[in-house]
Amino acid sequence: MSEQVEKVRRALIGRVVSDKMQKTVTVLVERRVKHPLYGKIITRSAKYHAHVEDGGAGEGDLVEIEECRPISRTKTWRVTRVVEKARVI
């Protein structure tokens, strides 16, 4: 009777633009949408603060973030994995 149903959490992929805070990174997520009237493809972007426990994500890394419970006033996302490390030139 009391089955535990796990909620489907939103997951996004974005690039880390700042890692200056302790245990927090700022992730820029870009998405492409079609303009409703003119039909042109537009790039929309949003920045999210995400919790990273062991400092595994650095600036320039491509990461996957997922929604979680509120960790602080601005953090409701957590880094689940690093998809691609930043290349040092």
Curated annotation (Swiss-Prot):
GO BP terms: translation
Encoding gene per record: rpsQ
InterPro entries documented for this protein: NA-bd_OB-fold, Ribosomal_uS17, Ribosomal_uS17_bact/chlr, Ribosomal_uS17_CS
Name the record gives this protein: Small ribosomal subunit protein uS17
Transmembrane segments: none
Keyword Ribonucleoprotein: yes
Keywords, alphabetical: Ribonucleoprotein, Ribosomal protein, RNA-binding, rRNA-binding
A GO term from the CC aspect: cytosolic small ribosomal subunit
Described purpose of this protein according to its UniProt entry: One of the primary rRNA binding proteins, it binds specifically to the 5'-end of 16S ribosomal RNA.
Similarity comment: family membership: Belongs to the universal ribosomal protein uS17 family.
Quaternary state and interactors: Part of the 30S ribosomal subunit.
Source superkingdom: Bacteria
PROSITE patterns in the cross-refs: RIBOSOMAL_S17
Molecular function per GO: rRNA binding; structural constituent of ribosome
